[in-house]
């Protein structure tokens, strides 16, 4: 039997999603809890591997099991065995042709900036603090150059292992909510550090350090060294993964917190 789960987590205390020897990971904690409930070893596949310090409100995983359990066992039961900063939001059986990663048609991230002269005391691990006068409209306008299928070499990590630098960005917006700025971006998939590298460069435009057309210039350059420094991990959230409607997966509010969908 194949089961799909929707999970959320605060990535502050984890060395990323992926299971690694001798460090704490979201995958290892989830597999440990699932294995207890299933009474057999469980391995999970996820929609998107998040880095150290990065959060998720809409991560999707699947696993195969011989165990027959009520739906509540895969939600309430698993949550009992998870640390407080990981939670299962929903669970449902799926066909064997469903794959959390390969069946996905889009991923959506939100990057939350706390724009204030002083650092935050609350949510300090859930937002990234940047001071200065940030022009959100400039950031939004500049970001539109990213839409479409593009070569994102300038925005991929040096150690990125993807076979191709091309990704298709479906939509991107930058908006202000009081002291908070939200960069919201959806694409078919993302390169390693792609969102944080994009945000780092957009911030340079918002601060007036680079011209409005700089994002287009960076796309043409195809050179990571020409773009800005990688933005901090704390403000980044995987908020949604899109699948064909035929799979019938639940759609919940994106978040984080009270942010509208």
Curated annotation (Swiss-Prot):
Organism from which the protein derives: Shewanella amazonensis (strain ATCC BAA-1098 / SB2B)
A Pfam short name: PseudoU_synth_1
UniProt keyword annotations, A-Z = Isomerase, tRNA processing
Q: Which family does it belong to?
A: Belongs to the tRNA pseudouridine synthase TruA family.
Q: What is this protein called?
A: tRNA pseudouridine synthase A
Q: How does it assemble?
A: Homodimer.
Output the GO biological process annotations, alphabetical, semicolon-separated.
tRNA pseudouridine synthesis
Name the active site residues.
Answer: 51
Q: Which residues bind substrate?
A: 109
Corresponding gene?
Answer: truA
